[in-house]
Amino acid sequence: MELKDQLMQQIDRERLPQHIAIIMDGNGRWAKERGKQRLFGHQSAIQSVREVSEASAEIGVKYLTLYAFSTENWNRPLAEVSGLMSLLATTITKEVVTMNKNSIKLNAIGDLKSLPKANYDQLMQAIKDTSHNTRMTLTLALSYSGRWDLKQAAQRMAQDVAQGKLQPDAIDDAMISSYLSTYNMPDPELLVRTSGEERISNFLLWQLAYSELYFTPKYWPDFRKADLYEAILNDQHRERRFGKTSEQVTAK
């Protein structure tokens, strides 16, 4: 029996995180160690996206969110950004058939209108073409940052207050969450970051308040199903207390 199958059997399906978020990091360093250009690392990372998406859907995860391109990534060399946009367009178009086969719904969050028009149109078409799927929602965070998300939420709330649609004293945690780009999904129970870096890099700042954080030294292009299962098993050995004591959590 392969390691991934052994690990999958150990997972408690009753305590499975419903939402996993992943910071896919290390593509450039992975490529550099092999004497290749950074774009080669991004191209090689597509297989990791396929494996993790399939593995998540297979075991029953309902939401998978991947940090694909941050607002800060626009500052990278033009050749790399152009290559990433081209890769995004090609991959999304190719993967629609596979997503439909696995009943995976595609979603996207971020300042999507900042994407090149061709990329935006292809993304919207893929979202439409997979909208009927119900097994799992795969969300790509594109031109996204946590601060951008909070800013756009604050701007929209301020506008609604000014127009009399929202009372200031009605603004609580749930209300703020409803204005974020992730309004239609639960907060992640588990955040995974690859490449050995141990920070959240402006990703889902509000939504990660109570998430468990899992860091692995593996670069994203090397991340496979077994690695995802190890992250989930690690999470299942932790106790989420939300500010309470262990005794209170156990009593509940």
Q: What do these predicted regions represent?
A:
Residues 1-252:
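Flexible, compositionally biased loop and terminal segments
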